């Protein structure tokens, strides 16, 4: 993360003692492990704080399992995620990188047509949480312009669209933006399960991330 960037909105100080939070760090082929871990550690507290706000306020995001979790997750991952949620996140991230607000708004409206009414409502609610919790940060670029458009009713404010902007603001790689989204979906669905049944392996997240990124010419390694 760029140390010169001035961000006035700071996450609450973490408690002295807390449970360890699992994360998945994916390294691009031309990136060193040390650099990847350093970049990720700088954004880790923000990601944990922002996503904890979503988890605290909502029961589910897009994934609301109708039955046993493992088969429901497999169907969701290979269906909804690979068919439209993952591609949307990639396209939104590309629009953010190019500073193309009109493209970002168009993608946001397109996603509305791919979600059922309940998913769309939860997606907008979660997107609103991210937008509110990053409002005070300075030098937001396209994230700030997108927020203004959403507040003016020009775009729905879906979670994945907002997350693409937030991830870029904190200089997260596309691979880690995708991986942390997947972890959030799983954690929200599995939070009431016994600990031994609620864990999703790093390799599982990395494998699905690779599938989503297929064709993006990225080689990924799990390092933490």
Stretch-by-stretch model annotation:
Residues 67-71, 110, 130, 224:
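Amphipathic alpha-helical hairpins
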Residues 2-41, 161-224:
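C-terminal auxiliary extensions adjacent to catalytic cores
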Residues 72-76, 148-149, 181-184:
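Short linear loop/turn motifs
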Residues 7, 18, 42, 55-57, ...:
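Arginine residue identity/basic-tract feature
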Residues 19, 26-102:
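Glycine/small-residue-rich interface belts in oligomeric ring/scaffold proteins
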Residues 90, 95-168:
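Internal, conserved structured core segments that host functional sites
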Residues 47, 82, 86, 116-127, ...:
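Generic structural signal for well-ordered, non-membrane alpha-helical segments
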């Amino acid at each position: 993360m760029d140390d010169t960037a001035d961000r006035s909105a700071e996450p609450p100080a973490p408690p002295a003692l807390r449970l360890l939070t699992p994360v998945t760090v994916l390294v691009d082929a031309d990136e060193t492990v040390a650099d990847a871990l350093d970049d990720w550690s700088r954004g880790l507290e923000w990601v944990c704080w922002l996503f904890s706000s979503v988890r605290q306020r909502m029961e589910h995001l897009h994934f609301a399992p109708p039955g046993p979790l493992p088969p429901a997750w497999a169907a969701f991952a290979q269906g909804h995620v690979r068919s439209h949620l993952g591609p949307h996140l990639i396209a939104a991230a590309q629009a953010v990188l190019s500073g193309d607000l009109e493209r970002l708004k168009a993608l946001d409206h397109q996603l509305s047509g791919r979600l059922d009414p309940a998913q769309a409502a939860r997606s907008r609610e979660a997107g609103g949480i991210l937008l509110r919790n990053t409002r005070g940060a300075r030098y937001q670029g396209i994230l700030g312009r997108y927020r203004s458009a959403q507040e003016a009713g020009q775009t729905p404010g879906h979670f994945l669209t907002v997350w693409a902007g937030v991830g870029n603001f904190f200089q997260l790689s596309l691979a880690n933006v995708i991986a942390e989204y997947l972890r959030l979906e799983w954690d929200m669905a599995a939070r009431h399960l016994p600990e031994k049944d609620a864990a999703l392996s790093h390799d599982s997240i990395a494998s699905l991330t690779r599938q989503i990124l297929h064709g993006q010419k990225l080689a990924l390694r799990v390092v933490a």
